[in-house]
């Protein structure tokens, strides 16, 4: 059974964001607008996404 994956795309810059938001974007492997990463769908990833939900777009794969 394969694990579910999420494709996370950064749609807004972190300029003007808090230190926590900047650190979370970096932890997700993002860093610039329109950058995409695929991550495992787990509670830890969902929590990180919730912190920066206004900066990213999430799609299930």
Swiss-Prot record:
Gene3D superfamilies, A to Z:
Ribosomal protein L30, ferredoxin-like fold domain
User: What keyword terms does UniProt attach to this protein?
Assistant: Ribonucleoprotein, Ribosomal protein
Q: Name one GO cellular component term.
A: cytosolic large ribosomal subunit
Q: GO MF terms on file?
A: structural constituent of ribosome
A single GO BP: translation
Pfam families (UniProt xref): Ribosomal_L30 (PF00327)
UniProt xrefs under InterPro entries: Ribo_uL30_ferredoxin-like_sf (IPR036919), Ribosomal_uL30_bac-type (IPR005996), Ribosomal_uL30_ferredoxin-like (IPR016082)
Q: Which NCBIfam families match?
A: rpmD_bact (TIGR01308)
Which family is this protein grouped under? Belongs to the universal ribosomal protein uL30 family.
Subunit structure of this entry?
Answer: Part of the 50S ribosomal subunit.
| Identification of the protein by name | Large ribosomal subunit protein uL30
